[in-house]
Curated annotation (Swiss-Prot):
Its main location: cytoplasm. Belongs to the GTP cyclohydrolase I family. QueF type 1 subfamily. SUPFAM superfamilies: Tetrahydrobiopterin biosynthesis enzymes-like. The gene is queF. This is NADPH-dependent 7-cyano-7-deazaguanine reductase.
Length: 136
C-alpha cells in the first residue's frame, strides 16, 4: 500500500457526493394541465443499508403518477434517490419517506410507488404505496 500523502482535493467530499447529499426533488410546470395522463419512472439501482446488519439492500423503484400542476424533474429525482445509498433505514421507512417527499414536491392527482427489493437470505420484499384519487 502506498504511503504517499493525499492532497487536499482527495480528502474533501467529491463534487458528486456533495451534489447527491444536497439534492432535493425539483419539479417543473405541467405542460398540459387540462389533460389527465400518467407518467411512469423506473429507478432500477436503488440502494440503502439494512439498519440491523449494515448490509446493502438493493431495489427497483417504479413511480407511476398523474401530475397535477407540477411534473418531477428526472435528474433531481435520480440524485435524491442516490442519497439513500449510505443511510441505514428499513424498507418500510424508506419507501414511506420517499412517498412523503414526492407528495410534498409534486402534489400529484394520484401516485403509486412500488419498491421491489432484491432477495437477501432467500427473502424478497415488495412494497406498494398509493396516494390520491386516480382520474380516468
Amino acid at each position: 500500500m502506498s504511503t504517499a500523502k493525499l492532497d487536499d482535493s482527495t480528502q474533501r467530499p467529491l463534487y458528486g457526493e456533495r451534489i447527491i447529499k444536497e439534492s432535493k426533488i425539483i419539479c417543473f410546470e405541467n405542460p398540459n394541465k387540462k389533460r389527465i395522463y400518467e407518467i411512469s419512472i423506473d429507478l432500477p439501482e436503488f440502494t440503502c443499508k439494512c439498519p440491523f446488519s449494515g448490509y446493502p439492500d438493493f431495489a427497483k423503484l417504479n413511480i407511476i403518477y398523474q401530475p397535477n400542476l407540477r411534473v418531477y424533474e428526472l435528474k433531481s429525482l435520480k440524485l435524491y434517490i442516490n442519497n439513500f445509498r449510505d443511510i441505514k433505514i428499513s424498507h418500510e421507512e424508506v419507501v414511506n419517506r420517499i412517498m412523503d417527499d414526492l407528495l410534498s414536491a409534486g402534489s400529484p392527482h394520484w401516485i403509486h410507488l412500488n419498491a421491489s427489493f432484491n432477495p437477501r437470505g432467500n427473502v424478497s420484499m415488495q412494497l406498494d404505496i398509493f396516494s390520491g384519487q386516480k382520474k380516468n
